[in-house]
């Protein structure tokens, strides 16, 4: 076999088929036609025109069976532990002023659009760039996965067109950052350095032996899950079409705006009108200013400044018949927004002024 290079083969291939096993060894090329010498264990040497080694140029990365994020229709429950510690539940029965709300934590609604975007980021997580395919305890510590920054436990389900559940399960995902690199990054922040070092981020599915490197943007998107990040940023979340009248208090004066439905309420092409002191006006500027009023950050700080404006919106909603919003001046940049008497958020004073000006345009134009 030595003359064919089969005493020290360049490749040995072990094949098992049922109860049979075979060993194929690849030797040198023939000098005449550059064909490969092979042995299949039957004591003979063969020349093959197609080199079997061409089919075995895959590296380990090509052969790993990567973990995957399952496809599902509904996230029934999402639990966070680590940097955040709370649970989100999917509930179509709980009442909320926003008809689209189906995700809640401790009875408080979250923004369905934001949760959906987060779930999309989870679905699209790229689990291909492995850093360990048989992770050890020492490696877990090196990757920061012995104490993950965030652990996500998601109970999911899928249903057919008739609403019958076809699949369900639980996904556990651990996310971390390299501890040494993170410490260097935080030190650079503290020292106000101009150039900040990179921090490697990792993901691990459940107790899988495979650990993946993920991008910083993927890590940031999946770990930005504080209650304030996932709750509604807009102050008024009801459908404005459910508003039937508005009581306004501005600079000590009271005003009432009234919605007048069309005579034929079943005709979708006919719109109702808004009036103030029996004068019809266009509600768009007011409704837009109200709908874009959003939190710059959230607070429970009691207001001490001057009241800028107060609105009580009457809604065609048995569970939430009224919504009262009062804005108090904080400084030249911000106001404190109180909803039904409770401080909720800081809002831009510019946006508050837009709302005030929309009211003045109606009252002064009547």
What are these regions (language model features)?
Residues 1-366:
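Secondary-structure "cap/kink" motif recognition
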């Amino acid at each position: 076999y030595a003359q064919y290079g089969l005493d020290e083969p360049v490749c040995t291939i072990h094949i098992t088929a049922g109860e049979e096993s075979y060993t194929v060894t690849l030797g040198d090329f023939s000098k005449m036609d550059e064909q490969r010498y092979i042995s299949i264990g039957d004591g003979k040497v063969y020349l093959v025109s197609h080199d079997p080694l061409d089919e075995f140029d895959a590296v380990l990365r090509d052969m790993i069976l990567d973990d995957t994020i399952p496809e599902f229709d509904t996230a029934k429950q999402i639990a966070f532990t680590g940097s955040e510690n709370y649970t989100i539940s999917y509930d179509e029965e709980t009442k909320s002023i926003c008809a689209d709300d189906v995700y809640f934590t401790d009875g408080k609604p979250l923004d369905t659009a934001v949760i959906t975007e987060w779930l999309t980021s989870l679905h699209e997580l790229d689990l291909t760039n492995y850093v360990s395919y048989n992770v050890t305890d020492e490696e877990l510590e090196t990757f920061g996965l012995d104490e993950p920054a965030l652990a996500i436990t998601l109970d999911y389900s899928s249903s057919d067109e008739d609403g019958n559940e076809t699949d369900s399960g639980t996904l556990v995902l651990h996310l971390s950052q390299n501890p040494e690199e993170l410490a260097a990054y935080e030190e650079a922040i503290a020292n106000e350095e101009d150039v900040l070092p990179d921090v490697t981020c990792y993901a691990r599915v459940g107790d899988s032996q495979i650990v993946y490197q993920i991008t910083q943007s993927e890590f940031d998107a999946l770990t930005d899950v504080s209650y304030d990040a996932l709750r509604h940023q807009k102050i008024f979340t009801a459908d404005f079409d459910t508003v039937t009248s508005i009581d306004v208090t501005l600079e000590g004066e009271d005003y009432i705006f009234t919605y007048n439905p069309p005579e034929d309420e079943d005709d979708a092409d006919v719109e109702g009108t808004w009036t103030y002191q029996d004068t019809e006006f266009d509600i768009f500027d007011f409704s837009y200013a109200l709908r874009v009023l959003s939190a710059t950050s959230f607070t429970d700080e009691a207001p001490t400044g001057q009241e800028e404006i107060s609105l009580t919106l009457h809604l065609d909603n048995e569970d939430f018949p009224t919504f009262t919003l009062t804005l108090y001046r904080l400084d030249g940049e911000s106001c404190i927004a109180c909803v039904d008497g409770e401080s909720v958020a800081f809002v831009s004073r510019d946006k508050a002024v837009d709302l005030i000006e929309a009211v003045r345009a109606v009252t002064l134009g009547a």
